[in-house]
From Swiss-Prot:
It comes from Synechococcus elongatus (strain ATCC 33912 / PCC 7942 / FACHB-805). The active site is at 86 (nucleophile), 194, 196. Part of the phosphoribosylformylglycinamidine synthase complex involved in the purines biosynthetic pathway. Catalyzes the ATP-dependent conversion of formylglycinamide ribonucleotide (FGAR) and glutamine to yield formylglycinamidine ribonucleotide (FGAM) and glutamate. The FGAM synthase complex is composed of three subunits. PurQ produces an ammonia molecule by converting glutamine to glutamate. PurL transfers the ammonia molecule to FGAR to form FGAM in an ATP-dependent manner. SMART domains: GATase_5. Its main location: cytoplasm. This is Phosphoribosylformylglycinamidine synthase subunit PurQ.
Length: 221
């Protein structure tokens, strides 16, 4: 698998993703500066966590206009795998690859903790190493992670099976306890928890490693 990790001014989880994909899983990984447009030869694009462009205006509002993200939209629309983690999830909603928005946490505080979430379906590339209903313990670190959407959008997400991960204790007040969603096709995933921070036992959990490892099988098949 050939992985591309987009790097914005203010990204701070890009190297964590690189360590998982290249260091732990041995996959070719290229860091893509936000001004680049060339995504040729890549199987997976990761839009990592951090504070792109300082979170000015609002999280992801400026990053959506970057050349790399415009190329990512085309990549996703052609069926390429795209993963947005934390700030990356916010950016994916800003560019319209995923519905809804991420807004201030219900308690107005930055939440940095490990939280349990449930796998809602295991028939997506992202969740193929998990079982439906399995509980994962993943870290969160965000101030604007509360997923919000209008009732019609929420109903569509549920009807289409687009909710992939759901909080058990909803630390931020997200609608329908949503922690991660896909697009209808399933090739784009946005999630607020950080799987790349739960990939080694020394970090306290390996529950996130399966998300990345599971992507290797469909590409190699």
């Amino acid at each position: 698998m050939n992985v591309g990790v987009i790097v914005f001014p203010g990204s701070n989880c890009d190297r964590d993703v690189q360590w998982v994909t290249a260091g732990l899983l041995g996959q070719s990984t290229r860091m893509i500066w936000h001004e680049e447009r060339d995504l040729s030869g890549l199987d997976l694009i990761v839009v990592p966590g951090g504070f792109s462009y300082g979170d000015y205006l609002r999280c992801g509002a400026i990053a959506r206009f970057s050349p790399a993200m415009q190329a990512t939209v085309a990549f996703a629309e052609a069926g390429g795998l795209v993963l947005g983690i934390c700030n990356g999830f916010q950016i994916l909603t800003e560019v319209g690859l995923l519905p809804g928005a991420l807004v201030r946490n219900r308690d107005l505080h930055f939440r940095c903790e490990t939280t349990p979430l449930r796998v809602e379906r295991s028939d997506r590339p992202w969740s193929r190493t998990y079982q439906q209903g399995q509980i994962l313990n993943l870290p969160i670190a965000h101030g604007e992670g509360r997923y919000h959407a209008d009732p019609a959008t929420l109903a569509a997400l549920e009807a289409n099976g687009q909710v992939l991960f759901r909080y058990l204790d909803n630390p931020n007040g997200s609608c329908n306890d949503i922690a991660g969603i896909t697009n209808v096709a399933g090739n784009v995933l946005g999630m607020m928890p950080h799987p790349e921070r739960a990939a080694e036992a020394i970090a306290g959990s390996v529950d996130g490693l399966g998300l990345f490892a599971g992507l290797l099988e469909p590409v190699a098949a």
